[in-house]
From Swiss-Prot:
Species, as recorded: Aeromonas salmonicida (strain A449)
GO CC list: cytoplasm
Top-level class of the enzyme under EC nomenclature: ligase
NCBIfam families in the record: hisS
Name of the protein: Histidine--tRNA ligase
Length: 425
């Protein structure tokens, strides 16, 4: 026997038993973003490597350690996309979507990072992202957060997530703060872990989110970014907080929240949970007003967020909030006796014409009545439609309820259609 070929580590199959949860999540995401006026954009999975180096920053974990990068047959360096914002901005610039206009876009699809696979973190993962271009104020930042808050309510997880907020100010303010932070950290250089020592000069703000307890103890007396912010940056942040408070959305200000990508400025936020253990971030985003110009477009204010869909699905499963997911099959059609197979397939097509949303599985492969009912029960269907010789002769169908105590009944095909339609409402 030939050796089995298995999926790449950290890149998982979504099996038929799992897909209904994903479909439900995707349906809710699509409905909500549409209600806020966003349109879908679909970008390629592979991009030129320098797109991500310019957008995310060359001295970041994503670019330095995690990207899947390869050289194609033309000698060009290409990468599987590690996130969606850079690709979305590139598409907007390339097709003239961002020139002097407001644009609201969303996307959903696989991303790739070479990380150590663990619960909630995979090498191929699916990301849902929302990006808005052309609006400056804190009002749109607040609306994006309200959008995510609506999602949590619809998913039933509002009580299990917490909003963390921070502001990174403008680049000139961060530069002054960066100098002050480096000067402070240099006093404790020998006490920092190896990763923080490396980041201290290349990307010192990332030291703030170090998980090392010794580093966190050193940071207690470190300079504060808030002390280096100008009036406009502080006013933007205060405006955002007021809008969230008026909307009844609770938040925590986390001055250590800096995000792992270089393009953010002003508002940054994360929705975190304790339901997933170490992988606590469900959704994250912020403002990136300089990125469009950085990638060759006209200066354009922008803000967005992204969420890892695997983590969201895992959270729903962990909290057992996926019980109402519709099964893959609603109705199973069993056919027994002479003439039933031909009549059965005609009936199945008639039912599909009349009830497009009905999930109907017709029995194939032969077998007696008992075997077919066993297959019907195993399919997860709530109802079995039974078509035997008598039903064929009389133009009727027998309805057997596989879940619950309702009695079996034999009715006309029109009556069966009406009954199934009523149950679908």
């Amino acid at each position: 026997m030939a050796k089995q070929i298995q999926a790449i580590r950290g890149m998982n199959d979504c099996l038929p038993e799992q897909s209904p949860v994903w479909q439900k999540v995707e349906q809710i995401l699509r409905q909500v973003v549409a209600s806020y006026g966003y349109s879908e954009v679909r970008m390629p999975i592979v991009e030129q490597t320098h797109l991500f180096k310019r957008a995310i920053g060359e001295v970041t974990d994503v670019v330095e350690k995690e990207m899947y990068t390869f050289e194609d047959r033309n000698g060009d360096s290409l990468s599987l996309r590690p996130e969606g914002t850079a690709s979305c901005v590139r598409a907007g610039i390339e097709h003239g979507l961002l020139y002097n206009q407001e644009r609201r876009m969303w996307y959903m699809g696989p991303m790739f990072r070479h990380e150590r696979p663990q619960k909630g973190r995979y090498r191929q993962f699916h990301q849902f992202g929302v990006e808005l271009f052309g609006i400056n104020g804190p009002d749109i930042d607040a609306e994006l957060i309200m959008l995510t808050h609506r999602l949590w309510r619809l998913f039933g997880i509002s009580d299990h997530v917490t909003l963390q907020l921070n502001t990174l100010g403008q680049s000139s303010e961060r530069a002054a703060y960066r100098d002050a932070l480096v000067a402070y950290l240099e006093q404790y250089k020998d006490q920092l872990d190896e990763e923080s020592q490396r980041r201290m000069y290349s990307n010192p703000l990332r030291v703030l989110d170090s998980k090392d307890e010794r580093v966190q103890a050193i940071l207690v007396k470190a300079p504060r970014l808030f002390d280096h912010l100008g009036e406009e940056s502080l006013a933007h942040f205060e405006g955002l907080k007021r809008l969230l408070e008026s909307a009844g959305i609770k938040y925590e200000v986390n001055e250590r929240l800096v995000r792992g990508l270089d393009y953010y400025n002003l508002t940054v936020f994360e929705w975190v949970t304790t339901s997933l253990g170490a992988q606590g971030t469900v959704c994250a985003g912020g403002r990136y007003d300089g990125l469009v110009e950085q990638l060759g477009g006209q200066a354009t204010p922008a803000v967005g967020f992204a969420m890892g869909m695997e983590r969201l699905v895992l959270m729903l499963e962990t909290l057992e909030l996926n019980a109402d997911i519709r099964p893959a099959v609603d109705v199973y059609l069993a056919m027994v006796g002479e003439g039933s197979e031909q009549a059965g397939f005609q009936l199945a097509e008639r039912l599909r014409d009349a009830l497009p949303d009905l999930r109907l599985m017709s029995h194939c492969g032969g077998g007696n009545f008992k075997k077919q009912l066993k297959r019907a029960d195993k399919s997860g269907a709530a109802i079995a439609l039974i078509l035997g010789e008598t039903e064929v002769q009389n133009g009727e169908i027998t309805i057997k309820y596989l879940r619950g105590q309702a009695e079996q009944q034999t009715v006309t095909v029109d009556a069966a259609i009406a009954l199934l339609a009523a149950k679908g409402d």
